[in-house]
């Protein structure tokens, strides 16, 4: 079945700006309404580290082409089982679920397999383009900024994996994300997300360099962590194999810079509560274990009262 990309522009009158959203895959069985964004979810400030934010807007452009190849060690199946378990424990066996920062749609697809009506939201056209190649008519993909997202209907749950939350660099922007989560959830709806920990940034990633070489491509990851600002920067250099009429392999070079912020649990809890959400628990990533001093990633669970 052919999937169609539809460009849906609208005017946000409150801020006199032109917001361009993409709705991808119009074959969704129950298309959601596309409506004007609520001003309460559109109060993103342009002050602060605007340069970094502009860089983030361009992130995952080249990397999207080889993301699944280099991220094949990510335990999406384990994550999806955990998320489904938590949703069902809270009486959510079906209904609309948002995958916020869905990337290429791997986790989104697994949650659709579990019976949920999935809405994948991401700000990267290239990542969504890769997700669209899965040709899964059960999933509605929306190109939206996490800080302003609006699924169109109240949903039963919002999930955000793969440290997507760490890409929100300013606390006021993260509060905007959480506020939009709160606005999107039904009463009693669940919010599940993961974040990288201070231990991962300070000890494991630090100022290290990682490299990997495969037939399809290679990458060099140069990491820098500023402990004072709590900002992690990593510069990616990619060499991606391209088809050639000659026998010799041709590799095209791409460069990207990514930024993430390290958040303390106490700060997250405060921002959640200020956004109308109730902090429930934090665990060592995708387990029911307590957070340890050497936990690399944690899972946070909250709900809308």
Residue map of PLM features:
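Conserved class I S-adenosyl-L-methionine
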Residues: 53-93
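C-terminal lobe and adjacent flexible extensions of AdoMet/dcAdoMet transferase-like proteins
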Residues: 259-305
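Short hydrophobic targeting helices and cationic amphipathic motifs
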Residues: 13-15, 28
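Class I SAM-dependent methyltransferase SAM/SAH-binding core
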Residues: 98, 105-148
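SAM-dependent methyltransferase
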Residues: 192-271
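A short acidic, Gly/Pro-enriched loop at the edge of an enzyme's catalytic core
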Residues: 150-157
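A short glycine-rich, Lys/Arg-flanked "PGG" loop and its adjoining helix->strand segment in the class I
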Residues: 175-187
């Amino acid at each position: 079945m052919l999937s169609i990309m539809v460009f849906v522009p609208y005017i946000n009158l409150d801020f006199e700006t032109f917001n361009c959203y993409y709705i991808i895959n119009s074959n969704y069985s129950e298309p959601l309404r596309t409506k004007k964004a609520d001003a309460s979810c559109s109060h993103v400030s342009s002050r602060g580290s605007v340069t970094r934010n502009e860089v983030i807007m361009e992130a995952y452009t080249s990397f999207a082409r080889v993301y699944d190849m280099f991220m094949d060690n990510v335990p999406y199946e384990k994550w999806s089982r955990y998320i489904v378990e938590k949703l069902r424990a809270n009486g959510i066996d079906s209904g609309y679920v948002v995958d916020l920062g869905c990337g290429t749609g791997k986790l989104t697809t697994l949650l659709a397999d579990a019976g949920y009506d999935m809405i994948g939201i991401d700000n990267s056209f290239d990542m969504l383009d890769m997700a669209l190649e899965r040709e899964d008519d059960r999933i509605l993909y929306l190109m939206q900024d996490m800080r302003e997202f609006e699924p169109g209907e109240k949903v039963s749950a919002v999930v955000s994996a793969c440290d997507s939350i760490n890409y929100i660099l300013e606390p006021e922007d993260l509060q905007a994300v959480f506020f939009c989560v709160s606005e999107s959830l039904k009463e009693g709806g669940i919010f599940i997300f993961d974040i990288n920990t201070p231990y991962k940034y300070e000890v494991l990633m630090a100022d290290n360099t990682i490299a990997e070489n495969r037939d399809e491509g290679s990458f060099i990851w140069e990491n820098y962590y500023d402990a004072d600002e709590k900002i992690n920067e990593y510069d990616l250099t990619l060499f991606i194999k391209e088809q050639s009429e000659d026998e010799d392999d041709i590799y095209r070079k791409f460069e990207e810079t990514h930024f993430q912020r390290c958040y303390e649990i106490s700060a997250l809890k405060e921002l959640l509560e200020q956004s109308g959400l109730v902090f429930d628990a934090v665990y060592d990533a995708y387990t029911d274990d307590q957070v340890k001093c050497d936990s690399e990633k944690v899972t946070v669970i909250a709900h809308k009262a």
